[in-house]
Amino acid sequence: MTHTTEIKAHILRDYRLAGWQERIVGRWHYRQLVADDDWRNGWISFDTVTYNPDDGAVYCGLNSIDGDLLYRFEPATERFIGLNSRRWTDPFDVKIHRTLLHNRSDRCFYFGTSLLHDIDQQREAPGGKLVRYDLTADRYDVLGVPVPMLYIQSIAADFARGKIYGFTYPAEALFEFDLAGRRGEVLAYTGNAMFFSQPHNPVVDGAGWLWGTYAETRAWDEKLSDVPIRLFKYHPEGRRFVWFDHGLPRKADRRQLLPDPPAPAGAASALAETRHRDDFGFCDSMAYDGKRYIYAGTVAGALCRIDTQTDAVEKMANVMATGRFPGLTVAEDGTLYGAGGMKGHTQVIRYRPGDERIDSFFDLVDPAINDGPARIHELAVDRDHQLYLAENDNHQRSSYLWTARLP
């Protein structure tokens, strides 16, 4: 399959952006970006999206230099409603990166803030905030700064145990935050001076284990091992870590469960343009099916699954032709949806457990504007299986939110 039956752009801001290749990339400092009116106000990304079954709306966390970070999108009216995050942001809170979590018990959202500033401003920046948003009362509560000076790349929650876990950035560590006591603690470092792991997002399984990836240290050696990026899991009871020697599969691995789905014509791997030029099984996304499997997407574009009962990892297929696979979500009926891609070659995939194939959809273009997402960073799905695609890092214009219905 190659086409969606319907894709539509939903435009929050619509700035045309100029000079990325000619003036900015590899040259500017962050302060210059902030000082430029068009880039400060127009260079937004939809970094995270979450469907709320209570009100049928989609909540959108942005990358926005001006600190305007949280919006509600109402599908029925196709309206964006700003949630006035600038009530609490400071100049260094410029992203809700991953993830925007909805707690069904208290009906609040939980998220962390991330950064764009350079290293010379780290002493001015207080660190990433953990925030709770009560949408019924329209009230924000800054729960704390789990790791001062560092910012929050992603979070996962075990609301039953009153825990939020997160990965920090740019120095990579795993923290645990106790919601009742509002206390944060660093549990482990996950990256190091030798290697950048950037696990993107962790998940908590049904038994309370937190899953993520880490980079080996090898301070005693000059050479990486064959598996420098590996899986770990952590349980708060007994504060137990299991550091595995295996990681996620690579695109070149030949053993896989399913055939590769069709790919867009002319879409070659763009891995060399990412921070991860080599395919070491870097984790780009994780989604738990609520039962047994954690699905994971790799930066190189492979889909795999982790069996939480045996800790085994299986490669399913190569699904993103260009690489980058940051979007994964599981619908209420168990259908897995994924999204990713680079350089305009973006894709959506669908897998129904038990099927012998993965469906692939590309040519994601809204005919009304003759344009499509440059990249997709995350996706959400509603009860009618409409998809919400979060575009990010478009350097020609403001990024948009996109809706898609698959045949």
Please report, for each region that a protein language model flagged, where it lies by residue.
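Residue-level detector of Asp-centered blade-edge/turn motifs that repeat once per structural unit
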Residues: N52-D55, H102-D106, D158-R161, V204-A207, ...
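Beta-strand-rich domains and repeat architectures in extracellular enzymes and scaffolds
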Residues: V34-D66
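Blade-level signature of beta-propeller repeat domains, shared across WD40, Kelch, NHL, RCC1
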Residues: P373-P407
